[in-house]
C-alpha cells in the first residue's frame, strides 16, 4: 500500500483535477483555491463523495452529553482540555469537531505533505460537528467518576469524541488533555494577557526529530511531560470540585463553578490511545490518585524499563489486530507481574485508527485508502472497546451500574475479540532500544 504522504498527494491532485480544469499555459491552483467557484465545486465533490459529513456516533448511555473547552493559565505551561460531561439537556448546538484551521495545517505537516493538503482537509472537515451540546449546563444532583484522556502522536484534544461522548453518556466526566510536549500536531497558548484579550493565539506545531537525533530520549522526555500534564489536569479539576475560584482563559459561556461538588474523588481513571497509552502507564506509575488505567493500542517505545514494576493499579490493554508487533507486545507483557491486575484483548479486523474519530468521518474508499478503517465495522469496533472499558471501570472504580453485563468482553469472549494478543512473541529477539515500531500518523 502507498505511504500516507503519497496517498494525501494523490487525493489532493485528484480533487484539484476535478474542480480546477488544468490549463497548462496558466496552471495556478494555489491562487485559484481561495475563489468562490473553487470552494463551491469542492463542496459539491464532498457531497457526492459523502466526505466530511458528521457520522461520529452518539453516546449509547442514558445521559445527554455536553461539551466545552477549558484552558487554565494562558501560557504553554498551563492546562488545555476538552471536557465531555452529562448535561441537563441537548438543545444546544452540536460541537464543532476541529475548531481551527491551524489543526489541519498541523496534520498536513505531520503527514509530511504540502500545506495545501491542510487547506483541502479544512474544506472537507472544517464545518463538521460532533454530537455533544456545546456549553450545555452540567446535569447536577450526583457526583460523577472522572476520566483523564491522553491523545496519540500527531493528534489533539478533539478527535477522540466518539470515546469521550459515549463515556459521558454513561455518567462519566471526561477531560481530554491537549498536550504541549510537541507531540500534538497543533496546539496553542497565549503569550500574555493582552494576547488573551484580543484572541491572538500562539501556535505550537509537531516537534519532529532532528537529523541524527536519537528517538528514545525525545519520546521519553515527552512522555514524562505528558504524565505531568495529566496529573496537573486532574489537580485543577479537583480544585474546581473543591470550590477553588478559577478562570477559564477561553471565556466561554460554560460556568466552571458548575463543576463544584460534581466529582466522585475516589473514582478516577486514565485512558489513552497509542502515545497516550504509554502516557497511561507512565502516569499510573507516578500518581496513585488514578485508580486504574486503560491503554488503547498503546505505543510502548517511549516507556523506560524502570516503570513497569511501579504500577500497582489495574491496567487493561485493548489492542487493534493490525498495529501491534512483537517488541511492543513484549513491553506490554512486562507489566504483567504477580499479584497485579492486568487484562489484554485484541479487536479482530481492526486498525490503529479505529479508536480515532477519522474512522467515522470518511467514506469507505477514503477510509480504506488511508487505513482509517479496518475489516471490522467502525461502529462495532468502538462499541466493543467502549463496553469493555465500562466493564473494567465498574469493577475497579466500584461503580454501582450495570456495566458488568459486558464483563465477558474484558476476557475477550466475543467472536470479534481475541483474548490476549494475535502476535506471536515466541523466540522473538526484541532489540528494545532500537525498535522500528514507530507510531503511525493518526491519518495513516
Curated annotation (Swiss-Prot):
It catalyses: a 1-O-alkyl-2-acetyl-sn-glycero-3-phosphocholine + H2O = a 1-O-alkyl-sn-glycero-3-phosphocholine + acetate + H(+); 1-O-decyl-2-acetyl-sn-glycero-3-phosphocholine + H2O = 1-O-decyl-sn-glycero-3-phosphocholine + acetate + H(+); 1-O-dodecyl-2-acetyl-sn-glycero-3-phosphocholine + H2O = 1-O-dodecyl-sn-glycero-3-phosphocholine + acetate + H(+); 1-O-tetradecyl-2-acetyl-sn-glycero-3-phosphocholine + H2O = 1-O-tetradecyl-sn-glycero-3-phosphocholine + acetate + H(+). SUPFAM superfamilies: alpha/beta-Hydrolases (SSF53474). The gene is PLA2G7. GO terms for biological process: phosphatidylcholine catabolic process; platelet activating factor catabolic process; platelet activating factor metabolic process. Residues 1-21 form the signal peptide. It is an enzyme of class 3 (hydrolase). Plasma. It comes from Bos taurus. Belongs to the AB hydrolase superfamily. Lipase family. It holds the Pfam family PAF-AH_p_II. Its main location: secreted. Its EC number is 3.1.1.47. InterPro entries: AB_hydrolase_fold, PAF_acetylhydro_eukaryote. N-glycosylated. This is Platelet-activating factor acetylhydrolase. The keyword Glycoprotein applies. It is found in: Secreted, Extracellular space.
